[in-house]
Every structure is written in structure tokens, then in C-alpha cells.
């Protein structure tokens, strides 16, 4: 096998069980396979949805890497030293696979890389620049702050749970604690909840929630 070595409990993150070069063609092929799978699952390339997880670590045979898509922006997060060093190759592969639909790549790994590696990584754009994309999930619109927000800016992996809440929300009172972007709140409102309370201790998060509400056409 071949993979990324790193000091710690996980010594090697395996990229391939066959002796193949980890070159530009490798990254393009892995990302292409992941993208085609998302289209098959109707997570990508469909109306009323421009937000999805393109790369989910081991699930896409790229352990240590997470890439979330928000409209025309890819937010890349490395959880291993090897992925950090490959970030520019990965960025070029993203551009090759996604083409003109990709306008920005933001690298956000300062808080996810092992501190013992002492890499001095800084968050920033690898491609494109300052932009504010509106994330659309199942027709609902959200303001995503991938620079200052938690994780990559939005909890993309909670899509099914948000939809489930919408199904059960009709005529109910809903309390959304630690609401962050208000994802669950908006789904509950669209589902017919009588009242929805969104609570978060962070003033920044509360402001983001308010901006999402003002994005209009949410309901």
C-alpha cells in the first residue's frame, strides 16, 4: 500500500493498495469519481441545491481530506500533514474536474492540522478571492461564513436530519439550541411549526442567523 505517514495513533493513511504514483492524475481521478457519485446521488448538479460534501475522507478513499461545496466555492480542510502538503495539487485537480463552475477555493486547516507537526498553516484562498456565496439546500438559502464559521462554515452532513425535522415540525413549538446558522430552524419553519426559538451564545453566530433570515425567499 501507499499512503501518508504521520506521527500519532494513525501511522499511515492509505491512499492506494496498489503501487501507483500519487501524481496530478491520481488527484483528478479520485475527485472525479467522488463528483460523479454526488451527481448520481442527486446531491450535485440538481436544482435548488448547490451545497454538498464533495470529499469525505476515507469514504472517498482520500483519508485526511474534507471538501465542502457552497455554490461556486470549495472549502478544503486537511486533517493530515500529507494532505496539507498536497493542497496545491488538490486545488488544481478541483479546477480540472469542476471547470468553470468553480470560482474559489478556500483552504481552512489552521485548526485541524496536528499541532505537533508545527506546520504554521494559515487559512486563505488558494484560488479566487473574497466572495460571499449563498448556500442553497433543498430550496432553503443560507449565508455561509467559511472564513470565521465553525467547521467549513455549515454542517453539510446534517442535511437528512434537517429534512426529518421539517417532516415532524407541523403545528409544533421548536427550540433550536446552539442554532449556529439556523439550519434546523428554517426547516422547522417551512415545515409549519407554530413558533421557532433559535438560541446561541455567540453574537457572531446570531448575526449570521439573522442575515440568513434576511436573505428572503427562505420561506
Give residue spans per PLM region:
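Conserved hydrophobic/aromatic pocket- or pore-lining residues that grip, position, or stack substrates
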Residues: 72, 142, 161, 178
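Single conserved hydrophobic/aromatic residue that forms the stacking wall/gate
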Residues: 212, 216-219
Amino acid at each position: 500500500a501507499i499512503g501518508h505517514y504521520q506521527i500519532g495513533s494513525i501511522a499511515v493513511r492509505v491512499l492506494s493498495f496498489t503501487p501507483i504514483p500519487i501524481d496530478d492524475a491520481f488527484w483528478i481521478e479520485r475527485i472525479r469519481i467522488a463528483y460523479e457519485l454526488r451527481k448520481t446521488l442527486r446531491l450535485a448538479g440538481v436544482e435548488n441545491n448547490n451545497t454538498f460534501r464533495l470529499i469525505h475522507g476515507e469514504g472517498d478513499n482520500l483519508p485526511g481530506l474534507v471538501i465542502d461545496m457552497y455554490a461556486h466555492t470549495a472549502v478544503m480542510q486537511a486533517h493530515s500533514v500529507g494532505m496539507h502538503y498536497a493542497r496545491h495539487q488538490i486545488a488544481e485537480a478541483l479546477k480540472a474536474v469542476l471547470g468553470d463552475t468553480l470560482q474559489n477555493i478556500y483552504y481552512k486547516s489552521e485548526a485541524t492540522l496536528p499541532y505537533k507537526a508545527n506546520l504554521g498553516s494559515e487559512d486563505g484562498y488558494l484560488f479566487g478571492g473574497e466572495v460571499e456565496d449563498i448556500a442553497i439546500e433543498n430550496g432553503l438559502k443560507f449565508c455561509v461564513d467559511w472564513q470565521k464559521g465553525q467547521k467549513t462554515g455549515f454542517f453539510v452532513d446534517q442535511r437528512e436530519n434537517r429534512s426529518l425535522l421539517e417532516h415532524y415540525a407541523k403545528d409544533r413549538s421548536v427550540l433550536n439550541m446552539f442554532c449556529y446558522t439556523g439550519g434546523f430552524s428554517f426547516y422547522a419553519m417551512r415545515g409549519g411549526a407554530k413558533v421557532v426559538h433559535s438560541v446561541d451564545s455567540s453574537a457572531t453566530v446570531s448575526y449570521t442567523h439573522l442575515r440568513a433570515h434576511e436573505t428572503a425567499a427562505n420561506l
